[in-house]
Amino acid sequence: MKDWLDEIHWNADGLVPAIAQDHETGRVLMMAWMNREALALTASENRAIYWSRSRGKLWRKGEESGHVQKLHELRLDCDADVVILMVEQVGGIACHTGRESCFYRVFENGAWKTVDPVLKDPDAIYEHAGHHHE
């Protein structure tokens, strides 16, 4: 039987874009990258685990903030080069800025306007972690 991971069209860096959506509202929470190991672990542990390109290592979403993403469903697009994670966002905050979604700016009149409130101060979220970005 063909390995389900072999069906994915990984990019030149061995990564696939992963979009996290709220499983109840459908709101897009964030986009990150996954390598083969991250996607396999996400499926086996039923929680979002990404690949941090900046840190060059696995990033277990919520490991510093507590804002874990519990996996409800995993979907693959028609070209097999993007995955969607339907998740329960623990704490209601996906973004390191303390907002529900990383997509909190809307293009209006030629400029990006911030439209979503900060739900929790990022310093309070990461005070025990030693840095500001998960």
From Swiss-Prot:
Mg(2+) binds at D77, D79, D81. It comes from the Bacteria. It is found in: Cytoplasm. One of its GO terms (biological process) is L-histidine biosynthetic process. Binds 1 Mg(2+) ion per subunit. This is Phosphoribosyl-AMP cyclohydrolase. Coiled coil: none annotated. Disulfide bonds: none annotated. One of its GO terms (molecular function) is phosphoribosyl-AMP cyclohydrolase activity. Gene3D superfamilies: Phosphoribosyl-AMP cyclohydrolase (3.10.20.810). Its main location: cytoplasm. Zn(2+) binds at C78, C95, C102. Its EC number is 3.5.4.19. NCBIfam families: PRK00051.1. It catalyses: 1-(5-phospho-beta-D-ribosyl)-5'-AMP + H2O = 1-(5-phospho-beta-D-ribosyl)-5-[(5-phospho-beta-D-ribosylamino)methylideneamino]imidazole-4-carboxamide. Keywords: Amino-acid biosynthesis, Cytoplasm, Histidine biosynthesis, Hydrolase, Magnesium, Metal-binding, Zinc.
